Amino acid sequence: SKGRAAIVCFPGIFYRGGAEQKIRKYLVDNNFVETVISLAPNLFFGTSIAVNILVLSKHKTDNKTQFVDASGADFYKKETNNNVLTEKHIEEIMKIFDTKEDIPHVAKCIEYEAIVDNDYNLSVSSYVEAKDTREIIDINELNKEIKTTVAKIDKLRTEIDEIIEVIEG
């Protein structure tokens, strides 16, 4: 009546249809899904695929589900052939799990209705927005650089034309 289970799963079970969707529907409708944690790829020997931890609970006090993206570089250490979860990484993930706080790009608690509206999809990426790591470009600065480069090219073309004229002269 007060049990909790943590199950290591491959990501596909969290979004595929068919029997897997029916199982997710049962777990969500009965308020058993406490947390879904996505981990970095290449953590387990023999597979480079990323895995998730599905935490089920029989004693939840609300109908929200927590989603945690622990796949970023802050949550593992790169070693020769594998990625490794250190004690520090595990403590950080557990702290996020325990507090159930929303952390931008890392953790978010989602209401039951939102999961139902999303066809019982339990993929972390559906609810936790990935951090935008693209370079921010100042368009005005870029236009200045292009203008300078074009001017240099024009100057070089003029110099080349003058050299060719002297050679052919």
Where are these regions (language model features)?
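A conserved structural/catalytic subdomain of Rossmann-like adenosyl-cofactor enzymes
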Residues: 1-169
